[in-house]
């Protein structure tokens, strides 16, 4: 006869295998993904598997007494709310996600959200509990932050990234159209066994994972929080691991920019009307009046030099013929899209990709151009003024104007560009960016996409006498 402990362990493995089979049926389409969670959900065993035998993924799963209790208690509570959490936006991760606590719902009042964070969890632990805790909810979307505890346990970044890739593949198999926001692992400290070089390597691998996953948006929450040395700031992470209220507020702002593009928040246009004497360059509804222009010989040569000298250089597609996007909501690849009154430069799956959208019209007369922009963390975009580019970025993180005092991270900021002759005077929220940027005597207005997501709105121009 088997010892009792061994028998219990084997029964737990059998039960876990059965749950994986149920999840497989859901993701393969044998069972409708729209049906509610199975009645047996609450009867499942939520104990940490006794061994790694037969478990998906690789790397550490914690089994300390405190973690086993946390895992069991949290997952039992998840089962109790499985029905009411159907179709929610799921926040998935470890103690940082669990730490949203009572902040989560007020942070996103427009959304039905559910918290599936388990303190102490690892990427493999998330992979193990994914079918019951997440897939069974048929989520509207998933926000994933995981990996920091794996590093503390000594797992190599490649092991962690492999598990995250499996998580993303499982989510895609369940619902290919379901958006996933993959958050970069937050900065911490070598004193927490989470050195900056390991975190940076892991986030680099995460960016690689999403290149062939169009439903996944990578959100640079590392740069959002890192200090000059690449570690957590004590004023936002008192223990150098978990964010405080300030940290969660910054994370909220970063997520809201992405949620707006996904159609989760900011779902209505503000019906903007241009100021007296101004005309709108963007009609709030589609890309009429905008298009692609042939890539210049100078840009083609710049791209070749950059890509030859730097393996990490941005992709830079060459446009051979002009293309107009009148009456279209988006460009064919979705990089530029009209969404609820905003002209959005979406985050590229390649992480960096140089693309340019231009007005079909050119502007030979002096003018004042006004617009507002909202940047996701560390975004790099730009505004072309008759050709030359004014950098438009998440300035405090991405530069070049890091000393701005009135810039509002994660919120709307106003750019005003006054062109007279061959000089452009440029401000952001009233602060001077450029006093005399040299521009040609005529040319179009353009928007650039490089890294991250940028939203533009209220794009209006007034020609001067």
Predicted feature locations:
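Carbohydrate-interacting regions of secretory-pathway proteins
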Residues: 165, 265-465
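Solvent-exposed loop/turn segments at secondary-structure junctions
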Residues: 95-99, 119-123, 148-153, 186-190, ...
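Structural recognition of the beta-strand scaffold that forms the well-ordered cores
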Residues: 89-91, 114-117, 141-146, 179-184, ...
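Acidic/histidine-rich helix-loop elements
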Residues: 57-66, 101, 109-125, 152, ...
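Oxyanion-hole/transition-state-stabilizing segment in secreted/luminal serine hydrolases
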Residues: 97-114, 123-165, 170, 181, ...
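Catalytic His-Asp segment of secreted/periplasmic serine-dependent ester chemistry enzymes
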Residues: 187-266
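N-terminal secretory targeting modules
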Residues: 1-92, 97-102, 107, 137, ...
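Charged, glycine-enriched surface loops/patches
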Residues: 161-183, 201, 205-216
């Amino acid at each position: 006869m088997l010892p009792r402990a061994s028998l219990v362990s084997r029964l737990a493995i059998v039960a876990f295998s059965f749950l994986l089979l149920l999840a497989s049926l859901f993701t393969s389409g044998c069972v409708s993904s729209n049906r509610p969670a199975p009645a047996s959900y609450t009867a499942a065993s939520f104990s940490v598997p006794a061994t790694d035998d037969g478990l998906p993924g690789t790397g550490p799963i914690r089994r300390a007494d405190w973690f086993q209790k946390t895992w069991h208690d949290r997952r039992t509570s998840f089962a109790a709310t499985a029905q009411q959490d159907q179709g929610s936006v799921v926040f998935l991760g470890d103690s940082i996600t669990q730490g949203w606590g009572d902040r989560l719902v007020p942070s996103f009042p427009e959304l039905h959200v559910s918290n599936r964070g388990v303190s102490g969890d690892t990427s493999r632990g998330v992979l193990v509990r994914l079918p019951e805790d997440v897939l069974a909810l048929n989520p509207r979307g998933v926000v994933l932050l995981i990996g920091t505890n794996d590093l503390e346990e000594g797992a190599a970044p490649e092991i962690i990234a492999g598990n995250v890739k499996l998580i993303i593949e499982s989510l895609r198999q369940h619902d290919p159209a379901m958006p996933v926001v993959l958050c970069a692992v937050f900065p911490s400290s070598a004193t927490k066994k989470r050195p900056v070089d390991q975190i940076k390597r892991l986030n680099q691998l995460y960016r690689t994972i999403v290149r062939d996953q169009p439903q996944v948006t990578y959100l640079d929450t590392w740069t959002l929080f890192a200090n000059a040395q690449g570690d957590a700031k004590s004023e936002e992470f008192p223990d150098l691991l978990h964010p405080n209220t300030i940290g969660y507020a910054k994370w909220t702002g970063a997520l809201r920019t992405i949620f707006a593009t996904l159609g989760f928040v900011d779902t209505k246009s503000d019906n903007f009307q241009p100021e007296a004497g101004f005309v709108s360059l963007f009609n709030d509804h589609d890309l009429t009046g905008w298009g692609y222009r042939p890539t210049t010989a100078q840009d083609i040569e710049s791209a070749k030099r950059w890509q030859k000298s730097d393996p990490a250089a941005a992709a830079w597609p060459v446009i051979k013929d002009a293309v107009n996007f009148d009456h279209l909501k988006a460009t064919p690849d979705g990089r530029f899209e009209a969404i609820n009154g905003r002209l959005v430069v979406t985050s590229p799956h390649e992480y960096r990709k140089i693309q340019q959208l231009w007005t079909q019209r050119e502007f030979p007369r002096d003018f004042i151009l006004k617009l507002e922009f909202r940047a996701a963390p560390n975004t790099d975009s730009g505004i072309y003024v008759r050709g030359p580019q004014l950098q438009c970025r998440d300035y405090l993180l991405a530069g070049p104007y890091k000393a701005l005092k009135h810039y509002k991270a994660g919120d709307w900021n106003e750019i005003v560009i006054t062109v007279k002759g061959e000089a452009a005077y440029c401000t952001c929220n009233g602060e001077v960016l450029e006093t005399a940027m040299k521009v040609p005597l005529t040319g179009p207005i353009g928007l650039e996409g490089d890294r991250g997501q940028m939203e533009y709105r209220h794009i209006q121009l007034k020609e001067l006498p």
